[in-house]
Amino acid sequence: MTQSRLHAAQNALAKLHERRGNTFYPHFHLAPPAGWMNDPNGLIWFNDRYHAFYQHHPMSEHWGPMHWGHATSDDMIHWQHEPIALAPGDENDKDGCFSGSAVDDNGVLSLIYTGHVWLDGAGNDDAIREVQCLATSRDGIHFEKQGVILTPPEGIMHFRDPKVWREADTWWMVVGAKDPGNTGQILLYRGSSLREWTFDRVLAHADAGESYMWECPDFFSLGDQHYLMFSPQGMNAEGYSYRNRFQSGVIPGMWSPGRLFAQSGHFTELDNGHDFYAPQSFVAKDGRRIVIGWMDMWESPMPSKREGWAGCMTLARELSESNGKLLQRPVHEAESLRQQHQSISPRTISNKYVLQENAQAVEIQLQWALKNSDAEHYGLQLGAGMRLYIDNQSERLVLWRYYPHENLDGYRSIPLPQGDMLALRIFIDTSSVEVFINDGEAVMSSRIYPQPEERELSLYASHGVAVLQHGALWQLG
């Protein structure tokens, strides 16, 4: 049965792929061949390849019964699509193979995922069953389901997104949950094998009324600290923060096996753009801690659905720690995308300075002299629909998008960093922009939807002058 369901899913995907349009399809980000994509799953280096699985609906560009899509890469940048890895339909995953993770268990690629069943009709979140399941593969392509390995504690129904790792000769698992009081929490388990698990403790939980569910947990050490990374649902916006439908971020602290997680800071968003959710981390072949997120947001318009697909991933980002602060930089492998180079000489800008008439896939580096720039706002624009600018009056860096025909309008912003200089590294793809600020101190990621004729890339300044100290641009391919 499983094979026939996989075969049917692959056939449906092939049919959808035949009619997929490319108006917004990315040049250098991982997106589904067709159909729907959301959370990254099972990110791992295995058998001399990077593997990225993901939540996938191959029958439609809309969310539906979740499969696990699959892609592989030798550099985390150039991805090759593989056959669909998991299809729902067995007793314990009848209505979805929800998110999870991957580990190498003595040469066996092991996927730990959530089996989801609707108990009272599809979409009724008040009546579900969620259990953790195992699927295994020796070749890294074809998987056999091994059944349920963990059931939820008494009184808990929402119980999903297992992230598994090995530490101190023990398997560990974090799972996102909603307690009976509708409060988000992360549960920690320890295992003698991938099939035998014991509850360790509630690793962390929301304050009452703060958020009702904590999804997609991850737990890892970096520098001198541990980071609990997760995606809370139900947080209220506070000023400029938490403006998206749902958030993703980290809590720092100290932990060792058998101990409490001693939090040393508050929840901080990982990305300050419009579109970032469900990040998952993994260890690269050389030991770097890498994170990839879903570059979309629940309940947002997704214009690419008109062309038979939806969803894409962020660039792979290397995490590092500096003075207790988490930094995110594009993996150095991203430089392999660079083709034609265009230097941007230092200049004073008082109106518009065109960089490219038709920017499809580019990397731009800009260094602004904040103290010497008196324009009310100045920065980079793509067509009339996307601006990344410094607002001198509010002293904030603003990422604004305006596509009224797509029902998309609004901005995200962060405080300008202290100091005289602002360094920006910007990746623009067909339908996305990712901005790395001051060598990874902050990141802003958003989907954008310019029409093909709306891709003029320019620098600009309004009501004053802006001083560019350094600039560079690369075509990417």
From Swiss-Prot:
Localization per Swiss-Prot or TrEMBL: Cytoplasm
Residues bound to substrate: W36, M37, N38, D39, Q55, W63, F98, S99, R160, D161, E215, W298
Gene Ontology CC, one term: cytoplasm
Catalytic reaction equation(s): Hydrolysis of terminal non-reducing beta-D-fructofuranoside residues in beta-D-fructofuranosides
Active site, renumbered: D39
Pathway info: Glycan biosynthesis; sucrose metabolism
Record's protein name: Sucrose-6-phosphate hydrolase
Organism: Escherichia coli
Source organism phylogeny: Bacteria, Pseudomonadati, Pseudomonadota, Gammaproteobacteria, Enterobacterales
